[in-house]
Amino acid sequence: MTSKVAQTRSEQALSLLRSGYLFASRVRRRAGVSADSGCPVRMPLLGKQTVLVRGEEGVKLFYDTSRVQRDGAMPEVVKGPLFGSGAVHGLDGEAHRVRKNQLADMAYEDERVAEYKPLVAEELAALAQRWQGGDNVYDSTAIAFGRASFRWAGIPWDTQEMDRWAHRMSRLLDTFGRPATQAVAWADRIALDRRFAKLIRDVRSGAVAAPEDSVLAHMAELVDEHGALVDEKTAGIELQNLTRPNVAVARFAAFAATALVEHPEWIERIRAASRAQGGTLLDVPEAVAFAQEVRRVYPFVPVLPAEATVDTEVQGCPVHKGQRILLDILGTNTDPASWDRAATFDPERFMGVADAEAITTFIPQGGADVRTGHRCPGEKIAVTSLSAAVVALCRPEVQLPSDQDDLTFSWTHMLTRPATGVRVRSTR
C-alpha cells in the first residue's frame, strides 16, 4: 500500500468530458504518477476538491456509509436523465436501506431470477429469425432484454409497446450527459417517467390489474422509510430502475460479440458446453465466465462520485468532510494490484467462481453488499442476460463480423459501445 499523495491543481471537468474512460489514467499522469498507480490523486473537479481513488482501499472508502454519502454528489445533468429524480441511487441512511431492500426483494432473490430466466431465453432464441436478414447485436438484444424484463415485471404491454419503451431506454443511454444530445435524453426521461407513473397510477386505481406478487404489483405498493406510500412518479422511476439496467446490458452484449471475434477459441468451447447441457442458453458455466470477464474488461461506467461526511483518509491521503470522492470503476476492475494479468482478457479467471460479487475489486455494477451498499440489485439478472446472449452468439448458424468497424469503439465517448452495434447474421 502506498502512502504517497499525488495531486494536480488544474480544474479537471473539461478533461473528464473530453477524455471519457481515459480520464483517470490521464489525471494520474498529470499528477506525476503512472497510469496504473493505485495512489489517490487530489484535484479540483467542478469547483470542488476531489480525491480520485481506485482498487481495494478505494472501494472500501467509497462504499463505507459511515464516512461517505451519495446525496448531492452526482451533477443533475447526469443523474437526472440517467436515474431519475428521487431514485434509490441518490438516497442515504435509513431511506436508502428501506428502498434498497424493497428493490432487492424484487430483483436479487434467486426465485425472482429464476422467473426471469425462461423469458430471456425465449426472447433470445427468437433473435435467430430476426438476424436472418441481418441486424446488430446492440439493438436486437436491447429489445430482447427489454421484452423479457417487462414480461418478468408483469407489465401488461403488447410487443409494439414493449419495443417502443425498450428503444427509448436504450436511446437514453446513448444521449445523456452530452451537450449535443442532452435534450433528447431529457425528452426520453420525461416520456418514460410519465408512462411509468401512469402505469403505477392505473394499478393503484384498479384500471390495470397487476399480476399477483409481480414486480409491478409490489412497485405500486412501494413505501418510504416511514411506511408511507411513495408518489406515483417515484414508484414509476423505481420500476424503470428494475428494468432499464437490463436493457443497458445490450452494451455488454455488443462487447461480448467483439470479444468472441477476438477470442474465437471460446466460441466452440461455449457451444460444446451448451450442447452438453441439452442446447440450453442458460447457466452455461463457460458462458457465465465469459460474460463476467466482458463485464470486467470492457468499459461501461468510467467513474462514480460520492461525498465525504466526515474527515477521513485513504492510503495516507486526507479526505475532508464535504470533499468529493471519485471512484475509478474501470481502473478498479483492471487494477494490476488486484488482478493477475489485469489487462489480459481471460474468462478462465472466473471459471469455478461461485460468487463473483464477493470479489471486492469487481464492481462493474457497483460494490459492497447489495442490500446495504450501492451494488445494483439486478446484477444476477444482468449476468443471466449477458451469458445467455453469449451462448446465442456462439450458435453454429450465427455469423459474427470480421469488419474492423464492428470491433472498435471510442475510449473518450461516454457511454461507449461499438458504433455499428456489431453486425450479425443468422443462416437459420
Model-derived segments and their meaning:
Residues 1-7, 32-53, 57-60, 64-428:
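Cytochrome P450
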Residues 11-31:
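N- or domain-start disorder-to-order transition segments that initiate the globular core
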